[in-house]
């Protein structure tokens, strides 16, 4: 393996580690809250070293904030794409179509996959605390 292959492998491993940390953190923060979740809990669930959080995020607070930034960015992009699709229709979109597109996309995280439901649980936990 040459050095470029080594670099790509490390980059791939780094992406996997970041993803595992985020997924583990999201699940645990949703269940236990920020204060109830220890770095060790996250890294054990992600099967990574506790140093990985410091390396990739700095600390638990930064990981928590990155999780919110990532999920909220995904939600915003989804809503914008849905509205762009409706707006790009050859005919002038009706108010009904616009409201339907927006509201369906707004409700989707409540009905969608487990990850979206975990984030909604985390989101409401944060709002309540």
Language-model features, listed with the residues they occupy:
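An amphipathic alpha-helix adjacent to DNA-recognition modules
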Residues: 15-23, 35, 56-84, 100
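Amphipathic alpha-helical segments used for helix-helix packing
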Residues: 112-129
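Regular secondary-structure segments
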Residues: 26, 107, 124-128
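N-terminal intrinsically disordered/low-complexity leader segments
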Residues: 1-16
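Hydrophobic alpha-helical connector segments
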Residues: 81-116
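Helix-turn-helix
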Residues: 28-67
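Short acidic/histidine-centered micro-motifs embedded in hydrophobic/aromatic stretches
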Residues: 45, 70, 122-126
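Short alpha-helical functional segments enriched in proximate histidine and acidic residues
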Residues: 28, 74, 109
């Amino acid at each position: 393996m040459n050095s470029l292959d080594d670099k790509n492998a490390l980059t791939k491993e780094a992406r996997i580690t970041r993803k595992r940390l985020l997924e583990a953190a999201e699940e645990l923060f949703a269940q236990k809250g920020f204060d109830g979740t220890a770095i060790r809990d996250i890294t054990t669930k992600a099967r990574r070293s506790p140093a990985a959080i410091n390396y990739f995020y700095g600390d638990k607070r930064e990981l928590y904030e990155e999780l919110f930034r990532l999920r909220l960015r995904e939600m915003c992009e989804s809503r914008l794409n849905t509205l762009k699709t409706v707006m790009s229709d050859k005919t002038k979109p009706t108010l009904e179509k616009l409201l339907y597109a927006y509201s369906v996309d707004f409700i989707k995280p409540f009905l969608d996959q487990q990850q979206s439901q975990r984030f909604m649980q985390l989101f409401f936990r944060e709002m309540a605390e």
